[in-house]
From Swiss-Prot:
Record protein name field: Beta-1,3-galactosyl-O-glycosyl-glycoprotein beta-1,6-N-acetylglucosaminyltransferase
Disulphide connectivity of cysteines: C72-C229, C163-C383, C184-C211, C392-C424
Glycan-linked positions: N71, N107
GO CC, alphabetical: host cell Golgi membrane; membrane
InterPro entries registered for this protein in UniProt: Glyco_trans_14
Record's function text: Non-essential glycosyltransferase that can synthesize all known mucin beta 6 N-acetylglucosaminides. Mediates core 2 and core 4 O-glycan branching, 2 important steps in mucin-type biosynthesis. Has also I-branching enzyme activity by converting linear into branched poly-N-acetyllactosaminoglycans. Contributes to the post-translational modifications of structural proteins.
Gene from which this protein is expressed: Bo17
Transmembrane segments: 12-29
Organism annotation: Bovine herpesvirus 4
Length: 439
């Protein structure tokens, strides 16, 4: 009788344990269904994309963490201890990673899916607002393949369209590596016409014009065109760019100011091009159509209608032809067209509408001769990196200031000078793209 009772109790215990296991299984199943998130098939239409759990999984798959020895959260907030540590870290040669080579990209792009996954490209639109507002890019490059790939990754979105112009003079392995990278994306292509780019000559403008023609012929209904070079990097997410471009309401944004007397000499004489650009004693005729000349820089944020008029409007084409033999025409062609009354999105030539590079959103640059004590009226503090052609190549100490500005991109970055600032910027932008919040 006692034995039978023990068996009954034992059987009851087993049933209780079995019931607990079944309950746990049901709860686990429900939780797994609730938190099911197939990152590989995640897209904008998926309900899962809106869940915090899926956002976390997506971020874990796509995050671009900087090396552990630097505190990017502190650097982006301007914490001086974190900045000093990053600058000291940058001085240690043994910690510097050699840049990825042309051969690396030629090998990894043999499997495009592996390349995009390993290099962590975002492969679907992150919002409907971004999907409905595609952006076009003209990317002019000539060296440093890793710089190009990291820039492309930072600005890449599948709804956008990207034209890449490679300098004809670039090494063949570099050109092949660029082709290999862009072959992995249906919305990235090589410009149909490539030119040899000579510093400060017309060829820099021609590279952008070639991309403009190709981009207008694409099937993507892009709204704005941004032009970039290999030392640029975005300081806004794609979503932030879309918002900023919408706020322009069809206007363009680029530097356009009255030229100094020294800059007027850039179009006073005819220039010749060999391997370099040199002036002649031949005086040029005045600008066509009595246009007042303005000066700016090579970078612009231009509406599609503006781009169309650059290529098709007879008055625009007369100015284009006139500036071809000037010095650094990219620094006065766009600035002058931005003040031409027939150009869509332009502004009047009146002094009230002069726009500095700090006011325009196209590009954030620190010029050496403007750096100084901000409390004494300087526009910005000294560069924490180094200078090249009087332009700051940013260091980690510049990042907090960079992120306080309204520009879409900044120039110049070079991982050989300071890779910490780029790593932190990549980590910051990727976190903000996925979560919409800062680090």
């Amino acid at each position: 009788m006692v034995g039978w009772k023990k068996k009954k109790l034992c059987r009851g215990h087993h049933l209780w344990v079995l019931g607990c296991y079944m309950l746990l299984a049901v709860v686990s199943l429900r939780l797994s269904l609730r938190f099911k998130c197939d990152v590989d098939s995640l897209d904008l239409e998926s309900r899962d994309f809106q869940s915090q759990h899926c956002r976390d999984m997506l971020y874990n798959n796509l995050k671009l963490p900087a090396k552990r020895s630097i505190n990017c959260s502190g650097i982006t907030r301007g914490d001086q201890e974190a900045v000093v540590q990053a600058l000291l870290d940058n001085l240690e040669v043994k910690k510097k990673r050699p840049p990825l080579t042309d051969t690396y990209y030629l090998n990894i792009t043999r499997d495009c899916e592996r390349f995009k996954a390993q290099r962590k490209f975002i492969q679907f639109p992150l919002s409907k607002e971004e999907l409905d507002f595609p952006i076009a890019y003209s990317m002019v490059v000539h060296e440093k393949i890793e710089n190009f790939e990291r820039l492309l990754r930072a600005v890449y979105a599948p709804q956008n369209i990207y034209c890449v112009h490679v300098d004809v003079k670039s090494p063949e392995t570099f050109k092949e590596a660029v082709k290999a990278i862009i072959s992995c994306f249906p919305n990235v292509f090589m410009a149909s016409k490539l030119v040899p780019v000579v510093y400060a000559s017309w060829s820099r403008v021609q590279a952008d014009l070639n991309c403009m023609e190709d981009l207008l012929q694409s099937s993507v209904s892009w709204k704005y065109l941004l032009n970039t070079c290999g030392t640029d990097f975005p300081i806004k997410t794609n979503a932030e760019m879309v918002l900023a471009l919408k706020m322009l309401k069809g206007k363009n944004s680029m530097e356009s100011e009255v030229p100094s007397e020294s800059k007027k000499n850039r179009w006073k004489y005819h220039y010749e091009v060999t391997d370099t650009l040199y002036p002649t004693s031949k005086m040029k005729d005045p600008p066509p159509d009595n246009l007042p000349m303005f000066t700016g820089n090579a970078y612009f944020v231009a509406s599609r209608a503006f781009v169309q008029h650059v290529l098709d409007n007879p008055k625009s084409q007369r100015l284009v032809e006139w500036v071809k033999d000037t010095y650094s025409p990219d620094e006065h062609l766009w600035a002058t067209l931005q003040r031409a009354p027939w150009m869509p999105g332009s502004v009047p030539s009146h002094p009230k509408y002069h726009i500095s590079d700090m006011t325009a959103v196209a590009r954030l640059v620190k010029w050496q001769y403007h750096e100084g004590d901000v409390s004494m009226g300087a526009p910005y503090a000294p560069c924490s990196g180094i200078h090249r052609r009087a332009i700051c190549i940013y260091g980690a100490g510049d990042l907090y200031w960079i992120l306080q500005n309204h520009h879409l991109l900044a120039n110049k970055f070079d991982p050989r000078v300071d890779d910490n600032v780029l790593q932190c910027l990549e980590e910051y932008l990727r976190h903000k793209a996925i979560y919409g919040t800062e680090l």
